[in-house]
Amino acid sequence: MKRFLKSKCHVFTVALFLSLMVGCKDDANNSVSIHDPDSPVQITDFTPKEGSARTRLCIFGSNFGNDVAQISVKIGGKKAKVVGSNGEMIYCIVPFRANEGSVEVIVGADSAYAKADSIFDYHKKTVVSTLCGYIDETGKKEVKDGPFSDCGFEGPVWLKIDPKNKDHIYLVDGTVSIRMLNIATASVSTVMQKGQGNWTELRCINFTMGGDSLLVSNQQDANDATAVSVMARANDFKRPQPVVYSRRNADCSIHPVNGEMYYNSRNSGDLFRYDWATGKSERLYTVKNRECLFWVFFHPSGDYAYITIPPKKIIMKAEYDWENKQLKPANIFCGLEGAQGSTDGQGTNARLGNPYQGCFVKNEQYVKEGREDVYDFYFADEYAHAIRYVTPEGFVYTYAGRGSQGIDSNPQGYVDGDLRQEARFKNPRGITYDEENKTFYIGDKGNSRIRTIVVDE
């Protein structure tokens, strides 16, 4: 019987879409296809009986109707995506964190309700998924706003969650525009093009400490170039105003406690500090040397910062001077200068590809162990085609990507699935983390897509 149901479900997934595409003139007189509010909704079975998030589930019964807009399915109390229904069978996708396993269906304006007698055995599994974006096999893409199901990107390279609205994620697309992901409405919109802000090459975005303004870094090869612009929330993040000037700046990092801003000059490799209270900037020191592209990422405590330096293939660490309210000179924390690779290891034994954006993520195991520093640092490693992380002790590990080795020996590509066994990225540059929902959002530049990793706990 179980094998029969699985086979039936597989056949249905094909037949359902064909029927939806072709249509049926007799639907109006088909009692199976239309929900009858005077009759009960019933669940007789579902298959498969177990699985993880994204499992395709078929629910069997009666009086479901065929209008998916009127059908709500919950697995383990979590809302599932309903793909289709023919009245006697619902095809849906198991959501993340459906741990409790109950299977429920609600239909119509009358909210007719049914619950399965048995539960779905949910298996926890953290995987890489695609949120939105598209590029075909020939590399053709279309940059456009719209719903997640029909939108496009140039190549997302930097992401930042709005601290006052976690459903809004702002991103730098290519180096030409600022766009926004609206998780609540599942849509993408363009906030501003570089020409509108009088920018040459967008590098990163950030929020001021209170979250009332959005900062934009501009890389322009001119002595009087606007290095950082500020856009107030009160103005809907429009009408950018220059804050500081520098030749070929890439950064606009904010100290999480004191709020001062750090920016740089790629030409000289200099790191600068800007004080909002005085409106003055000061040069701190040179990070490595000239032609040095880098970004500063502060630990949530503000005690130190990591500095990712893609051209040097290293991540440096700089302690914070609380008395003088500025970063101390940095030292190499992991990677070997000039040695590109993807080898995991500690300190200079690790090999990095091109470490770009990173974010600190609390490790609950560290909390249980009572460690002083409970954060790992996750970063997008462009040329390693992977998401990696470094521990407080300097151990570098590959978290996701470089999978599907049975396909070919090339570590890059576009594959969703298991973090290490299946998933592939292509030149990922951007990453941010929603701590509340335990979700990574990744700017997969080479695939022109936004990818996600929902930590299934």
Regions found by a protein language model. Name each.
Residues V176-M180, T226-V230, G269-R273, K313-K317, ...:
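A short loop-to-beta-strand structural motif that recurs across blades of beta-propeller domains
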Residues P355-F395:
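Loop/turn-rich, solvent-exposed surfaces of beta-rich toroidal or solenoidal domains
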Residues M1-G23:
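Sec-dependent bacterial lipoprotein signal peptides
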Residues I59, H123-V157, T185-R203, D221-A222, ...:
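Gly/Pro-rich loop segments of beta-rich domains
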Residues D162-P163, H168-T175, F207-N223, I254-P256, ...:
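Conserved beta-strand positions in repeat-built beta-propeller and related beta-rich domains
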Residues L159-I161, I205-F207, C252-I254, V296, ...:
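Hydrophobic core register within WD40 beta-propeller blades
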Residues C24-T130, D145, K164, H168-Y170:
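Ser/Thr/Pro-rich low-complexity tracts
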Residues F425-E457:
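Blade-level signature of beta-propeller repeat domains, shared across WD40, Kelch, NHL, RCC1
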